[in-house]
Amino acid sequence: MKRILIVTGQSGSGKSSALQVLEDLGYYCIDNLPLALLPEIVAKLDHENNLEQLALGVDVRSTRADMQEFDLVFEQLQKHGTVDVIYLTTQDQELIARFSASRRPHPLASRFKSLNECIQEEKQLLLPIQFRSTVHIDTTDKSVHDLKHTLLSKLGQSDKLILILQSFGYKHGIPLDADYVFDVRHLPNPHWDLELRRFSGLDEPVRRFLESSDQTNEMFDDIFHFLDKWLPVFAEGHRHYMTVSIGCTGGQHRSVYIVDRLKKALEAKWSIQVLHREMKHWS
């Protein structure tokens, strides 16, 4: 296991939201386990699973004795990877407002304590973990999206949208998972040239044939400029994946060529995955 994150902090500061962000980034997330059980669980996961990123949510519901033993737990976890502690905090008045708005009780609530007293007690209980924190985030004025971008910055993670470029053949059906579909069946078809039929859109003879057509170049330019303009907007909308499908008749020549050319034009800016759906049908 390469990286272990312990996510903790004051109740109401956004631990659940932070774990959701980390899950979206590919972390295997576990929440609300007692501190004393963490070394055993992590050792088991490290032995039985090929996990590279693990995030553990810890809160004040662990016992006082567990909290005092945090240094020992931390050292045991270090045997399995690099350990960072993300500590979330929020100003008292904002926490009170959040609990009032949600109408949920504080984990330390009782009929003998005010909400403010619960908040102060929790701060003291969490001190052993706070002293170990390597990432400290004040969420007082942060939305969930703000928290996401702060986490990405603090952890050195990329928030790049993953662009999936897919070629397909209309005769095999339109992909159901496509966000956008572009039809390139009007372009010159290498299939009707017997010398080109056996090749795919990845091969140089087909590339030369298609690039000799003004229509091909104009179609590519239009698709490229559309994606180049709008992908940043989609990414700002907090999308993690975008699937763009390019279709020709059989999914071997024209669509494959356009997908390959788009990949080369866009890969400097975006994380790209390529799928040639009809490859098994290529002659």
UniProtKB/Swiss-Prot annotation:
Residues binding GTP, per UniProt: D59, V60, R61, S62
| Keywords, in A-Z order | ATP-binding, GTP-binding, Nucleotide-binding
Binding of ATP: at which residues?
A: G9, Q10, S11, G12, S13, G14, K15, S16
Gene3D superfamilies per the UniProt record, alphabetical: P-loop containing nucleotide triphosphate hydrolases
**Which top-level group of life is the source organism from?**
Bacteria
> What sections of the protein cross the membrane?
none
Q: Does the keyword Iron apply?
A: no
GO MF: ATP binding; GTP binding
PANTHER family from the xrefs?
RNASE ADAPTER PROTEIN RAPZ
What function does the entry list?
Answer: Displays ATPase and GTPase activities.
Family per similarity comment? Belongs to the RapZ-like family.
- The name under which this protein is listed is Nucleotide-binding protein ACIAD3059
Q: Which source organism?
A: Acinetobacter baylyi (strain ATCC 33305 / BD413 / ADP1)
